[in-house]
C-alpha cells in the first residue's frame, strides 16, 4: 500500500525516534551505572577542579539534599506509592548516584559526573594517565591522547565529544515512559 508523502514522512520520522529511544535503554527502567564501579566527584576533581566546583553549585548536585525535602518530590512520590525517595529505584536511577558503601548500595551524591560520563572505576586511571610519570595533559603526545581516549571509552567512559553516547545517556533520564 502506498501512503502519500505527507503521511509516510511523519510516520517514518516517529518510527525512527522510537527506535532511537528504545536503543538507549530508557524503557528498561534502569541505567548502566554499576554502583560497584562508582567513584565520586572528588576523584574527578583531582584534575577537573573547576568543573567539579561548577557541578557542586548546580541543580544536578543539589538534588541529593534538596529533592528529598521538596514538596513537589513528596507529591510525586506519594502518587507513585514511594515512601523513601533515596531508597526507591524509580528515584535512585535518575536523581542520585549510588555506590557501594559498607557492602550496601547507597546514594552518595545527586546527579554526578559519573551519571553522565559513566562509572569511573574501570577508566579513571587510564583517563588520567598522560604517558609517563612526569607527563601532563600539556606534554602528552597526540598519539598517546588518542589511545588514552579510545581505551577510556572502551572501558565505559562517555566522553563529551561522543555526542551520540552522551545524548543516549542523557535521554536515559530526560525521556522517561512514566
Predicted regions and their residues:
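Non-catalytic accessory/assembly modules
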Residues: 164-171
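Solenoidal tandem-repeat scaffolds enriched in leucines and small polar residues
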Residues: 172-178
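N-terminal secretory signal peptides that target proteins for export/translocation
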Residues: 1-9
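Bacterial N-terminal signal peptides
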Residues: 11-25
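Sequence context of c-type cytochrome heme-c attachment sites
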Residues: 25-109, 114, 120-164
Amino acid at each position: 500500500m502506498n501512503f502519500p508523502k505527507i503521511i509516510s514522512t511523519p510516520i517514518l520520522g516517529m518510527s525512527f525516534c522510537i527506535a532511537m529511544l528504545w536503543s538507549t535503554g530508557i524503557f528498561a527502567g534502569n541505567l548502566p551505572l554499576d554502583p560497584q564501579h562508582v567513584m565520586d566527584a572528588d576523584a574527578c576533581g583531582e584534575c577537573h577542579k573547576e568543573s567539579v566546583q561548577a557541578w557542586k553549585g548546580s541543580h544536578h548536585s543539589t538534588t541529593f539534599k534538596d529533592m528529598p525535602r521538596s514538596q513537589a518530590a513528596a507529591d510525586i512520590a506519594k502518587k507513585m506509592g514511594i515512601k523513601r525517595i533515596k531508597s526507591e529505584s524509580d528515584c535512585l536511577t535518575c536523581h542520585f548516584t549510588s555506590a557501594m558503601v559498607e557492602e550496601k548500595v547507597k546514594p552518595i551524591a545527586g546527579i554526578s559526573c559519573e551519571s553522565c560520563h559513566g562509572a569511573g572505576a574501570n577508566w579513571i586511571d587510564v583517563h588520567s594517565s598522560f604517558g609517563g610519570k612526569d607527563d601532563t595533559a600539556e606534554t602528552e603526545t597526540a598519539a598517546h591522547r588518542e589511545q588514552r581516549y579510545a581505551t577510556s571509552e572502551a572501558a565505559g567512559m562517555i566522553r563529551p565529544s561522543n555526542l551520540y553516547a552522551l545524548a543516549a545517556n542523557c535521554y536515559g533520564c530526560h525521556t522517561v515512559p512514566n
